Amino acid sequence: MPKMKTDKGVAKRFKKTANGFKRKQAHLRHILTKKSTKRKRHLRAKCLVSKADVPAIARQLPYA
C-alpha cells in the first residue's frame, strides 16, 4: 500500500492540537481602514475549526 499524501495547502493553514485543529481567522488581509482596532485585534486570535469540518481536514492531514 503506498503512503498517503498530505495536502500541503491544508498543512500550511491548520495545526493539530489536543482540542482539534487550530486556524487563523479571515478578514485581516486588506480593507482594514474601515474595521475598528478592537475588531482587528480580535481577528488576530486563532480559533478552532468547526466540528463539521474536522473530518475533511483530518482526511487531508493523515499524519497530523
Curated annotation (Swiss-Prot):
Alphabetically ordered keywords of this record: Ribonucleoprotein, Ribosomal protein
Gene3D superfamilies, A to Z: 4.10.410.60
InterPro entries documented for this protein: Ribosomal_bL35, Ribosomal_bL35-like, Ribosomal_bL35_CS, Ribosomal_bL35_sf
Gene Ontology CC: cytosolic large ribosomal subunit
Pfam families: Ribosomal_L35p
Domain of life from the UniProt record: Bacteria
MF-aspect GO terms: structural constituent of ribosome
GO terms under biological process: translation
Recorded family membership: Belongs to the bacterial ribosomal protein bL35 family.
Name of the protein in question: Large ribosomal subunit protein bL35
Organism: Shewanella baltica (strain OS155 / ATCC BAA-1091)
Phylogenetic placement of the source organism: Bacteria, Pseudomonadati, Pseudomonadota, Gammaproteobacteria, Alteromonadales
Gene name linked to the record: rpmI
